[in-house]
Amino acid sequence: GSGLVGSEMCIRDSYTPKERYLRQIADNGLQDEVILHDRFIPDEQVKYYFSAVDFVVQPYKTATQSGVTQIAYQFCVPMVVTDVGGLSEIVPDGRVGYVCEPTVQGVADAIARMYDGDTIERFRLNCIEERKRFSWEEMCTRIAELYEMVR
């Protein structure tokens, strides 16, 4: 098994051929622990996925930003993101999730740390405050401040 007793993993990936995952799942005897979703998820169903998970892992090797991050904020779901592109700018390390090296070991270590004590719940609570940075109200306030500075 995975070593995480009573845990399941839900994978949503539209970029990697599913055969690769199916082979890894079978080779490791994880058929009862992994749910693979390799199809488009309509907007009206997204809430079910984010409500069912303890946290989101975005193990990108390269990225700029991620729409998944903003959705995770909306549902107050903690995150593990790799330190690529601008992800570390929108996921403060140790506050709403962990920013890790874009390596298998880096991601694995960050996932394990999520299960330390009350980390997940603490990150969920921090997310309530942190997500305000991305609200329309905050954006309008910052635009108005910028306008006043350049006027």
Write out the residue ranges for each language-model feature.
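Single conserved hydrophobic/aromatic residue that forms the stacking wall/gate
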Residues: 1-11
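Nucleotide-activated donor-binding/catalytic signature segment of Leloir-type glycosyltransferases, i.e.
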Residues: 19-40
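Short acidic alpha-helix that forms the nucleotide-activated donor recognition element
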Residues: 41-52, 70, 74, 92
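Acidic donor-binding loop of glycosyltransferase active sites
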Residues: 48-64, 77
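Nucleotide-sugar-dependent
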Residues: 60-70, 88-89
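Short hydrophobic beta-strand element within catalytic cores of glycosyltransferases
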Residues: 78-81, 91
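Conserved acidic donor-binding segment of nucleotide-sugar-dependent glycosyltransferases
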Residues: 93-104, 112-118
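A short, well-ordered alpha-helix in the C-terminal region of glycosyltransferases
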Residues: 119-133, 142-145
